[in-house]
Design a protein with these regions (language model features):
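Phosphate/pyrophosphate-binding loop motifs in nucleotide- or prenyl diphosphate-using proteins
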Residues: 1-207
Length: 207
């Protein structure tokens, strides 16, 4: 069987396909959000490469990578029609399950993933000294890069919020990304703590 070519030339004029075939501009908020998900996933992949001996953290980060891939796949589905159960932000969060009514053919409930991150954050925070001031990103290469991932994650959150102003975005996805940035921050602290690297703190000043 002949191998297909990687390039198609269909995007040479600045347009690309959504998962359902809809054509959108590569400069759209949709593509900005999906691209930032991919960027975060790649950065986390590089962080994983800096942690060859810590299988527990690597396993968790790879689980996060898979979740991000699933989120990106879900969001590439174009909402075909307005859902009467959605609120003004395009979401409907069940009080009992946290399940989002969105993209009927590709629903996923990320509430357990949020809970998993919250448990990780709480467990990790309990291991670390109390944080009494702001800290400078840095320390070990892995810790410094966890901060890079955190910053990209915050940018992803901003992209998703902007996108949600225009089209349905599951609210639980935004919650997940928000919590993920918190986890990446606490992970950066843990990585320095493991290697006994002191944190560099800065005083909060008014200028």
């Amino acid at each position: 069987m002949k191998k297909s070519k990687l390039y198609t030339r269909t995007g040479d004029r600045g347009m690309t396909n959504m998962a359902d075939g809809a054509r959108v501009s590569k400069g759209s908020e949709d593509i900005e959000a999906y691209g930032t998900i991919d960027e975060l996933n790649c950065n986390i992949g590089y962080l994983v490469s800096l942690l060859p001996s810590n299988r527990e953290i690597v396993s968790e980060l790879e689980h996060i990578q898979t979740t991000l891939f699933e989120i990106g796949n879900q969001l590439t589905q174009t909402p075909s029609s307005a859902n009467p159960n959605m609120n003004a932000n395009g979401t409907s969060l069940s009080e009992n399950t946290g399940c989002i009514i969105n993209h009927p053919d590709n629903q996923h409930n990320y509430t357990p993933d949020v809970s998993r991150l919250e448990l990780l954050i709480d467990e990790t925070d309990a291991e670390l000294p109390e944080l009494r001031s702001f800290i400078l990103p840095g320390g070990t290469p892995a810790s410094a890069y966890a901060h890079v991932c955190r910053a990209v994650c915050r940018r992803l959150e901003r992209c998703l919020v902007r996108l949600s102003d225009r089209r349905p975005v599951p609210h639980v996805v935004i919650i997940y990304v928000n919590r993920l940035s918190d986890y990446l921050f606490i992970l950066a602290r843990k990585l320095n703590f493991i290697d006994k690297i002191p944190e560099k703190t800065i005083a909060k000043t008014c200028r």
